Amino acid sequence: MAADHLVVAMLLLLALSPPAVADDTAVLGRKGGVVEGQAAGPGRYAVILDAGSTGTRVHVFRFDNKLDLLKVGDNIELFAKVDPGLSSYAGRPQDAANSILPLLDKANTVVPARLMNKTPLKLGATAGLRLIGDEKANQILEAVRDVVHTKSKYQYNPNWINVLEGSQEGSYIWVALNYLLDKLGGDYSKTVGVVDLGGGSVQMAYAISSNTAATAPKVPEGKDPYVVKEYLKGKDYNIYVHSYLHYGGFASRAHILERKDGPFSNCMLRGFSGNFTYNGKQYDATAAPQGADYHKCREEVVKLLKVNAPCETKNCSFNGVWNGGGGAGQDDLYVASAFYYIASHVGFINSDAPSAKSTPATFKAVAEKVCKLSVKEAKVEYPNVRDHAYLCMDLIYEYSLLVDGFGLHPSKEITLVDKVKHGEYYIDAAWPLGTAIEAVSPKKRLREIYK
């Protein structure tokens, strides 16, 4: 008798469930998660908090029933940021949680009150929080969960507030970028690759062939896999993705200074005396009396990358990491975040342009010029730069990362990207868009509730 009631209940559930619609105009679906073409409902919102190492950002996206982006207010998304990042509050979890309240207030101005309890709110903490240790990170995340649960009306799931795995971050960036460029739905060779340089880590992601994916090295249990499988606009993609923790822009400064030979740094501009603070620790950043030395600094940077580390596979990038084997999915390469910021601030690309073509060699040429300057001269020459004293170091690191780390030819054309033109709007080429699309999928949310 109980079994009969169970069958009736299941039939009723199926009858009441919205039908899956196969439609080539759907944006994307993750195999085993999002079903392509399933209606998201008119005016569905998603609130995504990007908790990076330097600050926390909120993105509010709105989608139609085909998961195409709709306007939020007068723009295609709402964006706001607070400084510093959650990791700066290590040991002060409540202060960390309270730091996101202004972002929730900002989201409240655009998400209709009647839709808040149906609007998923997700927080992905990236490299900064990974670096402060599990105990302190978990304390902060628990405090954030409590704030979201008790002080907001958004749809709450504790699993949606967590440290973002490196492979997730990289694959979401790849999905967002290729979606915005309308590259999805065709062969993997038509997609673009991406290198994203954050404060604490750098991600490389690009599509590879199924044959290459089959040769991916096994990784120890608990480590992110090298290949993430995605089902996007009717096509299967094997995405090589790796997050190099401790190799972000700010993390690299700390490690370069930590390893300096003697009391002075070969990478700091002449006239600078002081400390660099990263994750609560101070590093002496005093420049040599004669100033920066391009060649000595570059030697230190290449040594940091460990390009000659033992490689257990046929192809490695740096620090003994498999490089994905290369191929057509890496031919058209976009480089984002810190790469774009420094290039636009020193002026070798237009700071008003959302993206621009360049080469790694340009980073080298500017570095050779910058390293000869004093801090005072650099401030005059490059008024838009924020951390003038580190300019030589940063340029050398980014050049070395591209050429020595990822094996690019110095003259290879790359695209420096901040935003992507999609329709009439310019949208951030970042991971929050990828996770937002998944968050508004009814099938994915239903599966998360019942698993």
UniProtKB/Swiss-Prot annotation:
Binding site for ATP: 47-57, 193-203
Enzyme superclass (EC): hydrolase
Signal peptide interval: 1-22
Gene: APY3
Keywords, sorted A to Z: ATP-binding, Calcium, Glycoprotein, Hydrolase, Nucleotide-binding, Secreted, Signal
Gene Ontology molecular function, alphabetical: apyrase activity; ATP binding; nucleoside diphosphate phosphatase activity
Catalytic reaction list: a ribonucleoside 5'-triphosphate + 2 H2O = a ribonucleoside 5'-phosphate + 2 phosphate + 2 H(+)
Cofactor: Ca(2+)
Active site: residue positions: 169
Name of the molecule in the record: Probable apyrase 3
Biological role stated in the UniProt entry: Catalyzes the hydrolysis of phosphoanhydride bonds of nucleoside tri- and di-phosphates.
InterPro entries according to UniProt: GDA1_CD39_NTPase
Protein's organism: Oryza sativa subsp. japonica
